[in-house]
A protein has these predicted regions:
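Long, non-transmembrane cytosolic or organellar matrix-exposed soluble domains/tails
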Residues: 92-189
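Soluble accessory domains appended to multi-pass membrane transport proteins
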Residues: 2-103, 108, 112
Length: 189
């Protein structure tokens, strides 16, 4: 483990099939001691980590950001082509879209305008690392609607702050969706 730099004290690891999810405290010939985030201690034989897979979060910790990848499911019945009036309203009421011009001969949909807005909004936030991937994509539609996958990296990697940042961003998106005459899909019987 140590010779191949697979594991170091201070690394955050998760081990599938065990309750280990925390910071490596100690590595010996017989055990790897992990302090879990609930403050319990897990001990795992080094052989387990060599013979099976585990996830080491060191790369994320040392990188420029922590990945956020979530989807918002839009109600398919609310997706439509934008009228000229809709586009003018978007430009007037949503400052990030003030200079938006569709490609020649293209009539954008309200879903497309929302995706454009999401990308512009994320790139305007200092908490988002725009040097890393930022991808907004429409995935295959499902019985739960049309998923808009939002993929970006938060500059802040501290768990509590990371959760707050992504929650605030997605709260904002949920609040903006009606401005695009869209609805989030909600299952009802």
């Amino acid at each position: 483990l140590s010779a191949n730099d697979m594991l170091r004290p201070g690394d955050w690891i998760t081990v599938p099939g065990s309750n280990a999810n925390g910071i490596v405290q100690e590595i010996t010939l017989n055990t790897v001691k992990i302090q879990n985030f609930d403050n319990t201690i897990s001990t795992i034989p080094p052989y387990t980590l060599v013979s099976a897979s585990f996830q080491n979060w060191r790369g994320m910790v040392e990188s420029g950001g922590r990945r956020v990848m979530k989807s918002i499911f839009l109600d398919l019945n609310t997706i439509k082509f934008c009228t000229p009036d809709m586009l003018n309203t978007f430009r007037k009421e949503i400052p990030l879209l003030a200079d938006y011009k569709p490609d020649e001969g293209v009539t954008p949909t309200n879903s497309q305008m929302f995706r454009v807005y999401v990308e512009k909004y994320l790139t305007s936030l200092p908490v988002v690392n725009t040097d890393l991937d930022l991808i907004i994509s429409q995935l295959q539609s499902t019985e739960y609607g049309v998923p808009i996958q939002i993929y970006f990296f938060s500059r802040n990697k501290i768990w509590k702050e990371y959760e707050r940042i992504q929650s605030d961003i997605f709260d904002h998106f949920f609040a903006m969706i009606p401005k695009f005459e869209l609805k989030v899909y909600q299952y009802s019987e």
